Amino acid sequence: MESIILPSPDLHDVIGKNLQDVPDKSNGTLNRSRLASFSTTRDSSISWGRRHHHGSWLHSLGCASIMTLCPLIVIFYWIALSRFDGSLTSTYKTMAMMGPVNFLWQHAPRGNMRTNVGYGAWLLFQGILYQFLPTKLSSGQLTPAGHLLKYRTNGLSAWIVTHALFLISSCCGLLDPAILAKHWQALLISVNVYGFLLSGFAYLKAHLSPTHEGDRKFSGSILYDLYMGIELNPRFGKYFDFKLFHNGRPGIIAWTLIDMSFIAYQYQIHGYITNSILLSTFLHILYVVDFFINEDWYLRTIDICHDHFGFYLAWGSMVWLPSMYTLQTQYLSINPHSLSPLAAMTIFALGVSGYVLFRSVNHQKDLARRTKGKCQLWGAPADVLRVTYRTKDGKEHESILLCSGWWGLARHVNYLGDLILSYSMCAACGTNNLLPWTYAIFMTILLIHRCWRDEERCSKKYGKGWETYCQKVKWVIVPGIY
């Protein structure tokens, strides 16, 4: 589901395998399938990986601007919540009147060493769970250099252990359940510092000790490479995948812990808990638990298969996700909003409907992958398009593109379920303030941009096969509209 975050999957790559192991289907023995081939003309760089940029000053300026503005946006939102009752307008007017430098000097969050140590302990704890909890080894997709990597997918166990310890410690009086909310400003400093350090470390590791040299991408610009990343799958040892750990452990597990802490904070300062904060948190939990139950699915998303590990993913997963995806509970903890039974039921129904759509779409993809396209979708044989692509080692592989079921309605219909669920999460906060709706607005922009990236990547990867697919499935996200 994103993003940065919980990204929505790149679900077009349903199956990838070496063609020498695939029987010839061109004689029509597989009903309703066609084969489209694609050959690359580049020897030094496979065209369907991340694009090579040549370090123009414009790219460098853009990366520097994003790496500067994004942390400031996080700080700006915290100031709006803690100093101006969540009003973005009042916060902006005050900043314009005081000047940005004086405004930040007076209102910016302050960190402390105790919180830094606590955050370091959190990272260490999650690293121990990642490494030592029982796990199955799941396969990702072939990288552009031809590597098929195994991943430790024990995220659900890590989520359960973490939340069980949090709840037990809170119930036994060993831990203040509102501890995260009460130390939120210092935590924002800690996560930002770590996000920048992590980005720098990933940059240096890619130069000094790369895991898979063939899957690195260099642009010629230090800033662009720092932002977008160089290594595709940086690792320590055989199975400690740096990208999967940071994308899928500390930040996303913290998401629901932060929600619970702000629920406790609302109770401590107001004396009651509203149905709106419970509803928003329930939808978050549904989202996160589903992510971990289907963690092997995440290995086939654009985050793992396409994006290299730089500031975009490192800082985004460690800072943007836990700070901006929890805005609804942050806002409701200090601005309690009670929903009528009808409103609560409507929002709940919409949110669950979005989730069911998202899960149904993913199920169809997984079914086609497991059966190699020989399955029934909506009572009819699956309509699949078989396409080929090459990896950097020169081997040709086959993938399946679904053209029926949900995937016959739109090429990215999975994003529609994402958006319905995202807007439902924000709707629990009411319509009096724009701030808690930031998540839905961000997801809309992110998913549309991701569509463009996905379309470009698949076009390069599959060539004429992708053109044929687009002719069969004309709509992008919303059938009949876009």
Language-model segments: what does each one mean?
Residues E2-S404, I420-Y482:
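Membrane-anchoring alpha-helices and their flanking helix-loop junctions
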